[in-house]
C-alpha cells in the first residue's frame, strides 16, 4: 500500500503508528511542517513550507491556506492509495481539502472532546471534516459518542487503540541503577507521566504529596513531563515542603519510559479530560497499580477497587488516601498489576491494533477501486 499521513511529525504517537507500516514494507509518506528523529529509514517526509508574515494569528491562517495548495500538489505527485489525517480540527481539514479519497481521519481526543465545545467555528470545521471522511478512527467510547454528536454516521467509526509493545513495556524492565541514580532505592515510588499543563492538573498530585508523607515519610514521587506549569509546580512543591521527595525529571524519551515505569509501584493520572491514555496503558503493561481521575475514558480501563482506584477530579485528599492505601497494601497493589498486564495483552497489544488499522486501509482501498471500476462501466 501507498499510505499518506497528514499528522504531527514531532509526536511519538505519530512516529509509532507510521513506523509500523513502514517496517511492514508499505510505502509511507508523512506531510507536516515539523518532524523528529527516529522515523523508519524508508519513510518519506514532506515538510510544509511557511511563508506567512510573523504576525499572530495572521501567520497561522495564512500558512494554513498555503498548506492546502502544497498538500494538493503533493497528493497529486504521491498518488497515495489512502490518506490518514491525525487530529480532526487542523490536519483533518487539510485532508478534506486535498481533493482526494479515500480519507481516514483519526481522532486524538481533544479534537472531539474539547475544541468543538469551545468555539462554534471549530464545531463547524469538525462537522465538515467528519462528513468528508470515508472512515473515522477513535480509541475510546467517550470519543465515539462525541463523534456521533458531531454528526458522524455510526458505520463510519472504528475503535482502535494505539497499542502497547508489551515486550518493551514489561515489569522485567525494572532498573535498580536508575533508582539508585534518582536516590530512591528501597523506597515506594509513585510516578506521573503527563504534560505539565492545566488540562492534566498535576497540581492535584503535588497537593496530595504532603498528605501521603504524613503517613509514609519515605515515599518518593517522579513527575515526568514538561510544559508551561513546570516552574509553578516546582515552586508549589517547595512551598509545601516536599521538594526532597519529588523529582521533576522533565520530558522523557519514549525508550526511557519502560525503565521508569517498571521501577515504580503506583501510577497516577490527574487529567481533567482524556481519551484513552497511552501512558496509563503503558503503566498497566508494566504491572503498576493506577490511581486515576474519574473520566469516562479512564473507566473503560480501570474499575474502581478491582484493578486500580478512581478518584473525583480535583480531590487531592482522596488521591492521597488511595496512594497511601496502595503503598501499605502490597498484595492489593500486586493483584491490580497482574490484572492490568493481562488486560493490555488481551485488548491493546501494539501489533494486533496496528493490524486492525492495516485491514481497515485495505478494505477502504478495495472499496474505492471497486467504486471507480463501476463508474467506468
Language-model-detected regions and their locations in the chain:
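Carbohydrate-associated surface elements
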Residues: 142, 163
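Aromatic "clamp/platform" in nucleotide-sugar-dependent glycosyltransferases that forms part
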Residues: 272
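A short, well-ordered alpha-helix in the C-terminal region of glycosyltransferases
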Residues: 218, 318, 325, 332-347, ...
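Conserved acidic donor-binding segment of nucleotide-sugar-dependent glycosyltransferases
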Residues: 304-305, 309-316, 325-331
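N-terminal subdomain of nucleotide-sugar transferases
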Residues: 1-37
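Conserved donor-binding/catalytic core segment of Leloir-type glycosyltransferases
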Residues: 4, 178, 183-200, 206-209, ...
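Short hydrophobic beta-strand element within catalytic cores of glycosyltransferases
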Residues: 289-292
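Short alpha-helical donor nucleotide-sugar binding micro-motif in glycosyltransferases
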Residues: 75, 251-252, 259-264
Amino acid at each position: 500500500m501507498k499510505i499518506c499521513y497528514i499528522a504531527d511529525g514531532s509526536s511519538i504517537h505519530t512516529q509509532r503508528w507510521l513506523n509500523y507500516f513502514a517496517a511492514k514494507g508499505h510505502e509511507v509518506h508523512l506531510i507536516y511542517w515539523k518532524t523528529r528523529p527516529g522515523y523508519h529509514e524508508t519513510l518519506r517526509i514532506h515538510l510544509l513550507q511557511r511563508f506567512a508574515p510573523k504576525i499572530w494569528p495572521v501567520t497561522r491562517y495564512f500558512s494554513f491556506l498555503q498548506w492546502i495548495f502544497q498538500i494538493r500538489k503533493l497528493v497529486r505527485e504521491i498518488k497515495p492509495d489512502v490518506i490518514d489525517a491525525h487530529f480532526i480540527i487542523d490536519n483533518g481539514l487539510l485532508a478534506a481539502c486535498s481533493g482526494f479519497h479515500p480519507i481516514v481521519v483519526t481522532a486524538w481526543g481533544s479534537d472531539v472532546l474539547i475544541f468543538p465545545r469551545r468555539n462554534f467555528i471549530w464545531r463547524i470545521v469538525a462537522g465538515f471534516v467528519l462528513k468528508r471522511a470515508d472512515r473515522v478512527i477513535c480509541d475510546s467510547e467517550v470519543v465515539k459518542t462525541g463523534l456521533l454528536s458531531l454528526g458522524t454516521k455510526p458505520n463510519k467509526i472504528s475503535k482502535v487503540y494505539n497499542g502497547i509493545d508489551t515486550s518493551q513495556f514489561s515489569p522485567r524492565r525494572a532498573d535498580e541503577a536508575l533508582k539508585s541514580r534518582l536516590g530512591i532505592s528501597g523506597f515506594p515510588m509513585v510516578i506521573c507521566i503527563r504534560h505539565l499543563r492545566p488540562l492534566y492538573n498535576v497540581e492535584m498530585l503535588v497537593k496530595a504529596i504532603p498528605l501521603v508523607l504524613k503517613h509514609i515519610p519515605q515515599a518518593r514521587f517522579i513527575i515526568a513531563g514538561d510544559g508551561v506549569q513546570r516552574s509553578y509546580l516546582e515552586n508549589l512543591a517547595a512551598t509545601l515542603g516536599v521538594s526532597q521527595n519529588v523529582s521533576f525529571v522533565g520530558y522523557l524519551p519514549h525508550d526511557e519510559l519502560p525503565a521508569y515505569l517498571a521501577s515504580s509501584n503506583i501510577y497516577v493520572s490527574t487529567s481533567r479530560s482524556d481519551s484513552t491514555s497511552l501512558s496509563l496503558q503503558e503503566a498497566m503493561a508494566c504491572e503498576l497499580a493506577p490511581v486515576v481521575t474519574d473520566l469516562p475514558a479512564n473507566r473503560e480501563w480501570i474499575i474502581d477497587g478491582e484493578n486500580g482506584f478512581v478518584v473525583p477530579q480535583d480531590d487531592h485528599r482522596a488521591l492521597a488516601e488511595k496512594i497511601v492505601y496502595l503503598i501499605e497494601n502490597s498484595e492489593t497493589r500486586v493483584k491490580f498489576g497482574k490484572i492490568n498486564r493481562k488486560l493490555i495483552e488481551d485488548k491493546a497489544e501494539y501489533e494486533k491494533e496496528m493490524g486492525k488499522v492495516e485491514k481497515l486501509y485495505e478494505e477502504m482501498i478495495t472499496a474505492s477501486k471497486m467504486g471507480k471500476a463501476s463508474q467506468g462501466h
